[in-house]
């Protein structure tokens, strides 16, 4: 499945933001207008490259694996319930991968060639249920642990982009406005007190359109009417509130383990949200994270030191026509 898109330049977005500031001070609500029973399909493409260096005199299962992942597939989302909660609604939904073509390469020291293990996910696979709360947090997640790691990461990329509108001001946004938010890192890590400091800016409006997918996997604009999207630029920085000398999470303490170390990261996200429906039509993310951590038993024995350097790129696209729609 090949996707050819022109890269978006942050500098260009900020330059055009200055032009659109004169369009007025109107506030626009970017929340999606969802109804129970509504279904959506998103194409997700996720690529990551994680390098791990480990120093240890003992054999340990806790160090993460170095790996490259290249996955793309279709996610079907069904809205199960919409509960009004003030200015923002709480959404209960279910997701299922219709297709997921993925490649995973578990890198080992000295590897010079890519050892890709490719797989196609059964379209009759398991589902995942979840709730998006009015503050944008994703809760009551069921079924995630039963998915393949590539499915988990692809779904996490999608839900993070889809839930962005819930983190924005309840009274809407206007051109040039910035919105800051701090959220706890929701993916488990051996370092406690990790938080993302996010800043979103409403850059401009731009013509946009959902996508359609051919039976050959070619991507093009859908045959539906054109739309207009609000373009949001979001930057995020990973901050550590715990001490580097004692960064032990609670679940590590329960297993009589102690950790120390540091973590940092940056993300840049560009999101296109339909002004008509409030749906995310397209979103891209570039992410980079680094972690240097020491894990040992509570008494200081059996120390394992490793650092992780990870980079990823993801893209999600709203798809209104697919080969699965055709007989």
What does each model-identified segment do?
Residues 24-327:
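Signature of exported/secreted
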Residues 1-2, 229:
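Short intrinsically disordered, low-complexity coil segments enriched in acidic
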Residues 2-12:
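Bacterial N-terminal signal peptides that target proteins for export
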Residues 1, 17, 314-317:
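Residue-level marker of intrinsically disordered, low-complexity segments enriched
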Residues 2-4, 19, 193, 262:
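Generic secretory/membrane-interface signal
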Residues 14-23:
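Hydrophobic h-region of N-terminal signal peptides that target proteins for export
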């Amino acid at each position: 499945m090949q996707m050819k898109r022109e890269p978006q330049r942050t500098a260009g977005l900020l330059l055009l933001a200055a032009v659109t500031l004169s369009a007025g001070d109107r506030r626009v609500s970017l929340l999606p207008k969802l109804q129970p029973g509504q279904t959506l399909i998103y194409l997700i493409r996720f690529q990551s490259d994680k390098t791990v260096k480990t120093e240890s005199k003992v054999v340990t299962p806790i160090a993460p694996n170095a790996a490259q992942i290249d996955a793309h597939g279709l996610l079907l989302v069904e809205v199960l319930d919409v509960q009004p909660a003030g200015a923002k609604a709480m959404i209960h939904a279910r997701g299922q991968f219709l297709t997921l073509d993925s490649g995973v390469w578990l890198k080992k020291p000295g590897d010079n060639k890519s050892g890709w293990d490719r797989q196609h996910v059964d379209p009759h696979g398991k589902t995942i249920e979840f709730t998006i709360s009015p503050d944008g947090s994703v809760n009551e997640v069921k079924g995630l642990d039963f998915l393949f790691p590539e499915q988990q990461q692809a779904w996490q990329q999608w839900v993070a982009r889809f839930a962005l509108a819930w983190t924005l001001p309840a009274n809407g946004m206007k051109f040039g406005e910035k919105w800051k938010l701090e959220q706890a890192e929701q993916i488990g890590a051996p370092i406690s007190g990790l938080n993302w400091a996010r800043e979103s800016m409403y850059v401009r409006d731009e013509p946009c359109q959902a996508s359609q997918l051919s039976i050959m996997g070619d991507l093009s604009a859908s045959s539906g009417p054109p739309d207009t999207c609000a373009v949001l630029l979001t930057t995020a920085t990973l901050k550590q509130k715990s001490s580097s000398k004692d960064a032990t999470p609670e679940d590590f303490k329960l297993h009589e383990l102690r950790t120390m170390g540091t973590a940092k990261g940056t993300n840049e996200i560009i999101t296109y949200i339909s002004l008509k429906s409030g749906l995310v039509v397209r979103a891209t993310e570039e992410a980079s994270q680094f972690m240097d951590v020491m894990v040992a038993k509570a008494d200081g024995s059996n120390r394992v030191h490793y650092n992780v350097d990870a980079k990823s790129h993801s893209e999600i696209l709203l798809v209104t026509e697919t080969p699965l729609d055709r007989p």
